[in-house]
Amino acid sequence: MDKFVRLEGLVAPLDRSNVDTDAIIPKQFLKSIKRSGFGPNAFDEWRYMDVGQPGQDNTGRPKNPNFVLNQPRYQGAEVLLTRANFGCGSSREHAPWALLDFGFKAIIAESFADIFFNNCFKNGILPIVLPAAEIEALFQQVEATPGYKLVVDLSAQAVVRPDGHGIPFQIDAFRKECLLNGWDDIGLTLRHAEKIREFEAKRRVDQPWLFS
């Protein structure tokens, strides 16, 4: 997992509440357990005018011109700005995989569904909860300013607007440490690799019948 320390990224505004995981990545694309390759089908039913299928070439599919992420000014966005209860619905780790593969590294919202919130941290995405008033102000600024970027400083726990105004956010200390160091569940386990090897070696001596 890549480290997350500081990001200066273009912001895309998804002005919707209760965006569920089926909207983020529809169910027909859940057959793969690889973490990559889901980006082209993120928000598939909103991005395209037809129904997508796994393995389909998306280059010729008609795009929905009214969907915000299809607008040229938001191409390459790394920060997603949205409303309350983002990531609700069924539990699927494919949802953060799709968002990360699409290019998003941070999501700013009024609130998140608990399981989705946890899955973001496990996959290197920083979910940030801000008060509704701050969210509303950001929406107004993003929509009024082409090329609007935010600095997301995890070390300082602040979202910094172009005018220099910093908006503090809270994050669990352990999750912060994991993102700063790029530790996912496997990375955390590998930190104890030497002790694991020592345990396995001792176990082979103490319980040799398990390995015969």
Curated annotation (Swiss-Prot):
The pathway that the record names for this protein is: Amino-acid biosynthesis; L-leucine biosynthesis; L-leucine from 3-methyl-2-oxobutanoate: step 2/4
GO function terms (MF aspect):
3-isopropylmalate dehydratase activity
Q: Which reaction does it catalyse?
A: (2R,3S)-3-isopropylmalate = (2S)-2-isopropylmalate
UniProt-listed Gene3D superfamilies: Aconitase, domain 4 (3.20.19.10)
Q: Tell me, what does this protein do in biology?
A: Catalyzes the isomerization between 2-isopropylmalate and 3-isopropylmalate, via the formation of 2-isopropylmaleate.
How does this protein assemble? Heterodimer of LeuC and LeuD.
The name of this protein is: 3-isopropylmalate dehydratase small subunit
The organism named in the record is Dechloromonas aromatica (strain RCB)
